[in-house]
Structures are given as structure tokens and as C-alpha cells.
């Protein structure tokens, strides 16, 4: 027998983290995802279940340099920078017992 709590009761809430970028993507549009989810009411939809929602806003990473792919990779240094930013933001929320979305 374990003393593990259900996940929902172990969490302090959820945190919305926007990463508005389409760097590295073959098609444009992914950068609009965070705004679209907010306009669609993701925070309200989650909070109606009694879950605390923290909107952390959008991360601010490097701009798209609009260059051709090199060896099959699009904007690799910028993609790495975005991933590091997102990693740090997710780690901070997990460290605060929050589920990052």
C-alpha cells in the first residue's frame, strides 16, 4: 500500500506558458497557438473544475530569421534557444508543484 496522493490533489494548480513561435516549423501558424487557446477560454475551461490556473504569459524568444534550412534543419540555434526558455519555464512551474500547459 502506498501513500501516494491522486495527481490532482498533489498539484497546486496548472500554469499556462505560451511559446509563440513557428521557428523550425515547415509551415507558419504555430506561433498563433497560445493566443488562440487564450481566446478560446482555456483558463476558464480548466478553472471551472476548481483548479487554480496561473497564466504565465508568453515567453519571449528569438525572432524567426527567415532563412533556408541548413542540412534539413531550420534555424537550429533559435530552436535551441526557444527550447531552453521553455525548459526553464516548465521546470520552474513543476518545482512549484504546478502542471505546466
Sequence positions of predicted segments:
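N-terminal glycine-rich anion-binding loop in soluble enzyme alpha/beta folds
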Residues: 2-78
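Active-site pocket-lining segments that scaffold enzyme catalytic pockets across diverse folds
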Residues: 78-101
Amino acid at each position: 500500500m502506498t501513500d501516494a496522493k491522486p495527481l490532482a490533489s498533489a498539484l497546486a494548480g496548472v500554469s499556462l506558458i505560451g511559446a509563440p513561435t513557428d521557428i523550425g516549423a515547415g509551415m507558419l501558424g504555430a506561433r498563433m497557438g497560445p493566443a488562440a487557446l487564450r481566446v478560446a477560454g482555456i483558463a476558464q475551461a480548466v478553472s471551472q473544475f476548481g483548479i487554480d490556473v496561473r497564466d504565465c504569459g508568453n515567453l519571449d524568444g528569438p525572432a524567426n530569421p527567415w532563412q533556408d534550412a541548413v542540412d534539413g534543419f531550420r534555424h537550429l540555434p533559435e530552436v535551441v534557444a526557444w527550447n531552453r526558455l521553455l525548459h526553464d519555464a516548465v521546470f520552474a512551474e513543476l518545482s512549484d508543484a504546478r502542471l505546466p500547459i
